[in-house]
UniProtKB/Swiss-Prot annotation:
SUPFAM superfamilies xref list: PCD-like
Stored InterPro entries: PCD_sf, Pterin_deHydtase
Keyword vocabulary terms for this entry: Lyase
Protein's name according to its UniProt entry: Putative pterin-4-alpha-carbinolamine dehydratase
Gene Ontology terms describing biological process: tetrahydrobiopterin biosynthetic process
GO molecular function: 4-alpha-hydroxytetrahydrobiopterin dehydratase activity
Recorded family membership: Belongs to the pterin-4-alpha-carbinolamine dehydratase family.
Amino acid sequence: MIHKLTSEERKTRLEGLPHWTAVPGRDAIQRSLRFADFNEAFGFMTRVAIKAQEMNHHPEWFNVYNRVDVTLSTHDADGLTERDIELAQFIDRVCAHTLPAA
């Protein structure tokens, strides 16, 4: 079974993810990203999709034109796990050059 992060683990791990915020009413984190155009946004999603498939851990996301909203939570654990932290860190590395979300 996948280990759901404790409150203390969650606090410690999220300190290293300043662009991510808690989702109200859920044990999940989210980040909104804005890219130069649709092609850049879709390229980002493709890179994340490949990593997510390797991890067997898939994000919830929403895309309109140059904007991508990502939510991470582990359904099997009913909350935030180390898998979510790992995928969030990967996303942060991939999108280090993005525009600030509007």
